[in-house]
């Protein structure tokens, strides 16, 4: 970690206001960052390489309306063979620069047919459906903060549809079956994905305020007839629905 920070200190001057972790297909957000420096993960000592399509593996340092940000364009997943602790290495690095908030984003499956695809969801609880430490799904409550209230207010003011609900973590890499989706819904899940939860736990462990925002790119298996879920469709839909996602993050960061 020392070598990593020593390398990054050459490019990061002063404290950071917000850090952002981008989910699959949501990388158009980086176009909003000004005066940016782009560092490739593979050139940063101690960093892992990203392998999943839609995760470029870049750390972007810059500004949004004079607000200092670090943006991780690419994340690491449990199904790639990384432990929660390894996934949390990125959070530990970001925490070193004293961000006020960590915005953890993802593209996820929508489990509520009353919600339109392309709408956004902010997590107010988490369901650990990984069965790594328990033979039952485990509920983790989200501790609300002033930043969450601000985000909800900004969404309302700008007519951005922002639902609140439970994000469900599965290990992947295959998508859930229709029976699994039904069970997740019965446990109160509103969105499902293969990331984010490890980062949330690491933020919680380090007392780093965080908000989890999901772009709902597809409906869960079995909710629509004859629909097959493919990763390329998730990426395409994330790009298709990028405007509200980008606008919400930009407006929120500008308000800091």
Question: Where would I find each of the regions flagged by the language model?
Answer:
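Metabolite-binding pocket within alpha/beta catalytic cores that recognizes anionic/polar moieties
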Residues: 1-139
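Generic non-transmembrane alpha-helical segments
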Residues: 7, 11, 150-160, 247-255
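Non-catalytic positions within long, well-ordered alpha-helices that form the structural scaffold/packing
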Residues: 94-98, 185, 204
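Short acidic/polar active-site loop segments enriched in Thr and Asp
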Residues: 100-101, 190, 209
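Active-site/ligand-binding-proximal alpha/beta "capping" segment
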Residues: 153-190, 256
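Zn-dependent metallopeptidase/amidohydrolase metal-coordination segment
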Residues: 194-233
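His/Asp/Glu-rich mid-to-C-terminal helical/loop segments that flank catalytic regions of hydrolases
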Residues: 221-256
């Amino acid at each position: 970690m020392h070598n990593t920070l020593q390398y990054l200190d050459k490019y990061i001057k002063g404290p950071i206001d917000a850090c952002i972790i981008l989910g699959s297909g949501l990388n158009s957000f980086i176009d909003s960052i000004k005066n940016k420096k782009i560092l490739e993960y593979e050139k940063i000592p101690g960093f892992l390489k990203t392998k999943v399509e839609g995760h470029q593996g870049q750390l972007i340092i810059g500004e949004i309306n004079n607000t200092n940000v670090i943006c991780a364009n690419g994340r690491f997943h449990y199904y790639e063979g990384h432990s929660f602790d390894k996934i949390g290495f990125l959070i530990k690095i970001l925490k070193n620069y004293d961000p006020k908030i960590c915005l953890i984003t993802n593209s996820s499956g929508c489990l509520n047919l009353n919600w339109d695809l392309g709408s956004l969801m902010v997590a107010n609880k988490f369901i650990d459906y990984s069965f790594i430490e328990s033979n039952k799904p485990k509920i983790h409550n989200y501790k609300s903060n002033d930043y969450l209230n601000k985000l909800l207010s900004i969404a309302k003011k700008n007519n951005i549809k922002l639902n609140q609900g439970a994000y469900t973590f599965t290990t992947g890499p295959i998508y859930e079956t229709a029976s699994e989706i039904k069970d997740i819904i019965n446990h109160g899940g509103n969105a499902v994905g293969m990331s984010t939860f490890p980062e949330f736990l690491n933020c919680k462990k380090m007392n780093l305020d965080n908000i989890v925002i999901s772009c709902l790119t597809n409906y869960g298996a079995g909710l629509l007839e004859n629909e097959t879920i493919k990763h390329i469709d998730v990426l395409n839909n994330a790009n298709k629905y990028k405007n509200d996602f980008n606008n919400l993050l930009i407006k929120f960061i500008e308000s800091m």
